[in-house]
């Protein structure tokens, strides 16, 4: 099966939702993020890959307003002042254990004092989209890890943010549940085209989900490459895996990433010695 494949050199998006220029983040003598500059377009599904400790999560926390920058600039366009700027989904459970599935999904809307009828409609819609309708009255301890991440996804989309930030949200799941949630996430995203910034260690996941992939170097974290993913949407993982372009993209990204992973491992060994 042959799919159209564009050149690997990606142009900057014309209408940025996020603009980062010469961003540095230091923790004492340690430089975590080193002069990163990039634009992310409205509605783009933007993936970040890099070795452990390269500053990926630090960058995402800065975008979420959870960390400050040392120098540089970030501009986030917010065309709708009634929406929250962002929602963040973390690696582990980030839902409230004392709340039901319904109350977790409704939390952001209630904090914004959205009218109750609207909350009912919106939460009902996203619980249905994530297959959680019949679990609305369950508590997190009654759910599997995959179902808890579905709740986090439902809550994030229900809150209707301008930007969705995702930090390896499926990394703790088994392969089958990970694939199911990837497909569910894409289906919901294709309906609403939120701007998504998604961190992953999986090159396969980056190619399956993303419009464009940023490869980061080992510490200090710099931009090594931007790789476009010109595969048609909607995507089906079974069909993609049959296409030579899919494998070519994975090989191209891994060739860029491999040396950085080795360098990160060497840095870890030096710190231990």
What positions do the PLM features span?
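A short, proline-enriched helix->beta-strand linker immediately N-terminal to the Walker B motif
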Residues: 158-162
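Conserved ABC ATPase signature
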Residues: 139-143, 147
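Conserved ABC ATPase "signature" region
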Residues: 110, 117-135, 187
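The feature captures the beta-strand-to-loop junction immediately N-terminal to the Walker
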Residues: 49-51
């Amino acid at each position: 099966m042959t799919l159209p494949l564009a050149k690997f050199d990606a142009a900057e998006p014309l209408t940025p939702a996020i603009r980062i220029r010469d961003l540095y983040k230091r923790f004492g003598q340690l430089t975590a993020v080193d002069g990163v500059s990039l634009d992310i377009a409205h509605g783009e599904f933007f993936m970040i890959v890099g070795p452990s400790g390269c500053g990926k999560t630090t960058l995402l926390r800065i975008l979420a307003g959870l960390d400050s920058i040392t120098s540089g600039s970030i501009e986030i366009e917010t065309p709708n002042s009634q929406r929250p700027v962002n929602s963040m989904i973390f690696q582990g459970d980030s839902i409230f254990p004392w709340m039901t599935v319904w109350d977790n999904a409704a939390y952001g809307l209630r904090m914004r004092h959205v009218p109750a009828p609207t909350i009912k409609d919106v939460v009902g819609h996203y619980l249905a989209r994530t297959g959680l309708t019949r679990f609305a009255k369950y508590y997190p301890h009654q759910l599997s890890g995959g179902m808890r991440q579905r709740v986090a996804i439902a809550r994030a989309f229900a809150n209707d943010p301008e930007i969705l930030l995702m930090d390896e949200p499926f990394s703790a799941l088994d392969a089958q549940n990970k694939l199911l949630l990837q497909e569910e996430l894409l289906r919901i995203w294709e309906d609403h085209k939120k701007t998504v910034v998604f961190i992953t260690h999986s090159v396969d996941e980056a190619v399956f989900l993303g419009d464009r992939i940023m490869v980061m170097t080992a510490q200090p974290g710099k931009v090594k490459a931007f790789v476009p993913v010109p595969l048609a949407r909607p995507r089906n993982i079974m069909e993609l895996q049959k296409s030579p372009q899919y494998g070519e993209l994975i090989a191209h990204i891994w060739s860029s990433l491999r040396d950085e992973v080795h360098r990160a491992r060497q840095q870890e060994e030096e710190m231990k010695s």
